[in-house]
Each structure stands twice: as structure tokens, then as C-alpha cells.
């Protein structure tokens, strides 16, 4: 009798242990299933409930072991479906990034327009700008005549003289100042060209006074001389006739007279 009681008590202990393990395994699978279900948007019906089988089998059956191994949910294809869900926010992030870049370009254009300021006839973008060309001032013949006469008197005007001349001609002081600056630059350019022309004429006149004519090339520079061929007497006379007058022409008729 005691032996049978010990055997029944051992069986009850093993059954209670297997039931506790199956219950703990089912609790773990439930917790994992709930955590996975809240983290993803996929319906819960896709996951088979293998871990919720009642512990009808023996103490060493597959229920307790299966409850532990199948604590995590799985898809019927063998791969967890939570890998497909992260791609959606990634693509959304890409589209959002492209939209963000477009918005930033528009913001840059608006900021560029805001920073573009025209100050004193200059376009300034962030403090750096290019000058705007102002329209050229068209002077009348009377104004040009008066300005030229005053320039012949003096090339530089003092401030009171410039103000007086501008008021007399109906111009601004800036217009008078710019006209005198341009006139001085043109005058200096003409004087420089004139001095270079005079120097060239002086060199030409000094070369023409030399005994050798600059228009006639020397004998070794002539094309016939470079070839090395004989130079005829007639061609030599024709080329150097104005500078060479042979004396044998006077002696040639004398033998004929004899």
C-alpha cells in the first residue's frame, strides 16, 4: 500500500509539473503574441495558435515542449511578417525627403529675393552685388561746346567751378565730373599715340639719311643672291640704276669710232 501511494503521488507531481510548464509556456506565448500584435499592423488571424493546445497528453508529451518552442508567433511561409512593415515608412520617408528638398529650394529662392537689395544703383545680394549700368547722358551741342572750351582752359575743375558750370549748363555735378574724366583719358590716349607716331617718323628720317637706301635690299638679301646663281649685268643695272651709273658706257663708243 505505501508503495502504491508513493507511485500515485509521483504521478501527480509529474502531471502537476507538466501542467505548470504548459501553463507557463502558454502564458509566455500569449505575452509574446500580444507584444508582437501591438507592434505590427498585420491581422492576428494569420498566426496559428499552436501554443494554446490543452495539456491533454502525457507529462512528457509535445504540449509543454511545443509551448516553449512556439512561444513566438510565426507566419505560415516560415518567415516573420514583421519584415514587410518597415518598408512602408522607409518609402514614405523618401517621398517626404524629396518634398522637403523641394520646399527648401523654394525657401532659398524666397530668401534670395529678400536679400536682393538695390542700393545707389547697385544690385546687392547678401552684401555683394554688381553695378547697374546707368543710361548714357546725351549732351546737347551747346553743352558740348561749353565743356570743350572750359577743358581747353583747364583740365581739372575745383568744386565751386564745377558747381557753377553744372548750374550754368543745366547738368548735375556728377555729369560734369564724368565728362571731364572721360575727356582727360581720351586726351592722354591721343597724346600717347601722337608721341609714338613722332618717334616712328624720327626713326624713318634718320634711316633715310644713311648712305644705303632702306628700300633696296643688300646683295646677300636678294632672292637671286640666295640661290647662288649668276646675276646678269642688265638686271643689276635695272635694279640699281638710280644708284649706280657705270663709266664704261662712255668708253664703249670710242672703239667704234676708231
Curated annotation (Swiss-Prot):
GO terms for cellular component: nucleus. Transmembrane segments: none annotated. GO terms for biological process: cell differentiation. Residues 194-228 are annotated as: Disordered. Its main location: nucleus. The keyword DNA-binding applies. SUPFAM superfamilies: Homeodomain-like. Keywords: Developmental protein, DNA-binding, Homeobox, Nucleus. Residues 132-191 bind DNA. CDD domains: homeodomain. Gene3D superfamilies: Homeodomain-like. It is found in: Nucleus. SMART domains: HOX. Expressed in regeneration blastemas. Detected in forelimbs, hindlimbs, the tail, flank, and brain as well as in limb and tail blastemas. Signal peptide: none annotated. One of its GO terms (molecular function) is DNA-binding transcription factor activity, RNA polymerase II-specific. Belongs to the distal-less homeobox family. PANTHER family: HOMEOBOX PROTEIN, HOMEOTIC PROTEIN DISTAL-LESS-RELATED. This is Homeobox protein box-5. The gene is BOX5.
Amino acid at each position: 500500500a505505501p508503495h502504491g501511494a508513493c507511485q500515485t503521488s509521483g504521478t501527480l507531481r509529474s502531471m502537476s509539473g507538466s501542467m505548470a510548464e504548459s501553463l507557463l509556456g502558454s502564458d509566455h506565448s500569449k505575452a509574446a503574441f500580444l507584444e508582437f500584435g501591438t507592434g505590427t499592423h498585420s491581422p492576428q488571424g494569420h498566426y496559428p495558435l499552436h501554443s494554446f493546445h490543452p495539456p491533454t497528453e502525457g507529462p512528457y508529451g509535445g504540449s509543454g515542449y511545443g509551448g516553449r518552442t512556439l512561444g513566438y508567433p510565426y507566419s505560415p511561409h516560415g518567415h516573420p511578417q514583421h519584415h514587410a512593415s518597415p518598408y512602408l515608412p522607409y518609402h514614405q520617408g523618401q517621398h517626404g525627403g524629396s518634398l522637403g528638398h523641394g520646399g527648401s529650394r523654394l525657401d532659398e529662392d524666397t530668401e534670395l529675393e529678400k536679400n536682393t537689395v538695390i542700393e545707389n544703383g547697385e544690385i546687392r545680394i547678401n552684401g555683394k552685388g554688381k553695378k547697374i549700368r546707368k543710361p548714357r547722358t546725351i549732351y546737347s551741342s551747346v553743352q558740348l561746346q561749353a565743356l570743350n572750351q572750359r577743358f581747353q582752359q583747364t583740365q581739372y575743375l575745383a568744386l565751386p567751378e564745377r558747381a557753377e558750370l553744372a548750374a550754368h549748363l543745366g547738368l548735375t555735378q556728377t555729369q560734369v565730373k564724368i565728362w571731364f574724366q572721360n575727356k582727360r583719358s581720351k586726351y592722354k590716349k591721343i597724346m600717347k599715340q601722337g608721341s609714338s607716331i613722332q618717334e616712328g617718323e624720327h626713326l624713318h628720317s634718320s634711316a633715310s639719311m644713311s648712305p644705303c637706301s632702306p628700300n633696296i635690299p643688300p646683295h646677300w638679301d636678294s632672292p637671286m643672291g640666295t640661290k647662288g646663281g649668276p646675276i646678269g649685268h642688265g638686271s643689276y643695272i635695272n635694279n640699281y640704276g638710280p644708284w649706280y651709273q657705270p663709266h664704261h658706257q662712255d668708253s664703249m663708243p670710242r672703239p667704234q669710232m676708231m
